[in-house]
Each structure stands twice: as structure tokens, then as C-alpha cells.
Design a protein with these regions (language model features):
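Solvent-exposed interaction patches of small proteins and small membrane subunits
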Residues: 17-21, 151-152, 212
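Short, hydrophobic/aromatic alpha-helical segments in well-folded domains
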Residues: 74, 124, 225-226
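Transmembrane alpha-helical segments and their cytosolic interface motifs
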Residues: 22-31, 199-232
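Membrane-cytosol interface motif
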Residues: 83-100, 246, 254
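C-terminal, helix-dominated tail/subdomain
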Residues: 120, 215-253
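Structured inter-helical modules in multipass membrane proteins
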Residues: 98-210
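N-terminal juxtamembrane/topogenic regions of multi-pass membrane proteins
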Residues: 1-86, 105, 109, 231-238, ...
Length: 254
């Protein structure tokens, strides 16, 4: 998530990082080349015909409804992800506080290990949802923890497993009664649940039929739109197509 100042309109408008511009740039270039080619044909052969705008107005309304559904879906995924990240932070902090409440002050090394494992889990979840987990996210762990983690194919699950073992050892050390472990186990389950929920949001695609319908519909609409605009706007059609592609394809890419 990118932090920004909504009141600074100019900075938001001129921002590049985090926008959909990199995703739509290639599509925009191809559509402008297509529009330029049609302009050349119209000028070279001196074509004089007007398709009218009624059909494209009707198709545009239908396309807008499809894009509204896409926007609502994107916002729902964003909001659900934001809630899960909030739950991740709260659960991690609560687990750390509960751990410190049962581990004696004299066991600073054990306290540090538990805190490091919890912090590493949060970082692993973040990178798991991005480009993959690297050693940078695990540098806060001890060499023994990193070596133990090599036995697991999934670092986040491995960290939870190690955490469970370490916290269960508190029972053997008489630092907590067995019934108390249920609260810690519940927190570990919550951390696992957050990871699964974020995985679902990140990796569940939209239905293929919907994506296919939207992309084909948009390609036909934008591909034929210059034929409507050129007789009326001439070279200004290039500017009109720039904004049309940016608006429609940009919303579809969100």
C-alpha cells in the first residue's frame, strides 16, 4: 500500500509509482499507432464517411457497467486485504505481549527469540505476497532458527511451527499451565488464517469468462472508436484516443 496525501492534488496527479500507467502504456502506444494508421488512410484516400456515434454511445454505456463491476471488485479486494493486514499486526503484537507475560524476565534470550520469530513471520508474509522470501527477511533470526527453517518448504509455515514448539516448551519449564497454551495456539491459528486469506486475495483470479468478455468488448470498442472520431475531430482524434484508452484500460487494469 502506498501512503499519500490526498489533499495534495498536484502531487497525486503527477505521481508515477503505484499508478496504472506502466500497465497501460504498451496498449496505449499500439492504439495510438492504430489510430495514426487510420488517419493516414483517411487522408491519403480522402475518405468521406461518417459512421455516426449512436452505436458507440450504446456500447460505451454497456462497457461502463462492466468496468463499474471491475472497480467494485478491485476495491473489495483492497479493503479485505487492508483488514487482513490490520489483523496480522494486531495478532502479532498480542502474541508478543502474551509471550512476554509468561516468560520470566531472566530469560531475555528466549524472549528475544520469540520476538524475532514473530517479526520474521510478518516480514515473510509481506514478501511471500510479493516477489518471494529472501534471506534479508530472515536476518533477524538466529543462525539456529535459520538452520531449523531450512527443513520447511514454506518459511511462514515453518516459523509458525517453530513458534509453536518454543511456546509449548513454556509448559515444560512450568512458566504456564497447559490450559493457558490454548490462547497462544489460537493466536498462531489466527496468523495462519491471515496468511491463507491474503493468499486467496493475491492469487485468486477473476473468472475467465468475465475477463475474456471485458477484454474482447474493450478491444472492439476502442479499435473502432477512431472511425467515429476521425470524421469529426481529424488529428485531435489522437488526443481523444489517448484519454479514452487511459480511462477504459486503466480502470480495467486496477
Amino acid at each position: 500500500m502506498i501512503s499519500y496525501d490526498a489533499s495534495n492534488r498536484l502531487k497525486v496527479i503527477l505521481s508515477y509509482q503505484g499508478t496504472i500507467l506502466p500497465s497501460v502504456l504498451s496498449y496505449m502506444v499500439w492504439m495510438l499507432l492504430w489510430t495514426g494508421s487510420l488517419l493516414f488512410v483517411f487522408k491519403f484516400f480522402e475518405l468521406q464517411f461518417d459512421l455516426g456515434s449512436q452505436l458507440h454511445t450504446f456500447l460505451g454505456v454497456a462497457l461502463v457497467f462492466l468496468l463499474v463491476m471491475r472497480t467494485n471488485s478491485s476495491y473489495d479486494r483492497y479493503w479485505e486485504g487492508r483488514k487482513q493486514l490490520g489483523a496480522l499486526g494486531i495478532t502479532a503484537r498480542n502474541l508478543a505481549v502474551k509471550s512476554n507475560s509468561v516468560i520470566p524476565d531472566s530469560e531475555q534470550g528466549f524472549r528475544t527469540e520469540i520476538s524475532s520469530l514473530i517479526g520474521a513471520y510478518v516480514l515473510c508474509v509481506k514478501e511471500h505476497l510479493r516477489d518471494g522470501i529472501t534471506q534479508k527477511e530472515l536476518k533477524g533470526l538466529s543462525s539456529a532458527n535459520r538452520e531449523e527453517l531450512e527443513n520447511f518448504s514454506s518459511p511462514p509455515n515453518g516459523i509458525l511451527c517453530i513458534l509453536g514448539k518454543r511456546l509449548r516448551s513454556c509448559i515444560d519449564q512450568k512458566w504456564m499451565a497447559p490450559p493457558e497454551f490454548g490462547s497462544f495456539n489460537s493466536s498462531l491459528d489466527d496468523l495462519q488464517g491471515v496468511l491463507r486469506a491474503l493468499d486467496r486475495i493475491r492469487f485468486t483470479p477473476l473468472p475467465f469468462a468475465y475477463v475474456n468478455q471485458l477484454k474482447v468488448f474493450m478491444m472492439i470498442y476502442l479499435g473502432t472508436l477512431p472511425l467515429v472520431l476521425i470524421p469529426q475531430f481529424d488529428y485531435l482524434t489522437l488526443i481523444g484516443m489517448f484519454f479514452a484508452v487511459y480511462a477504459f484500460v486503466g480502470i480495467e487494469e486496477i
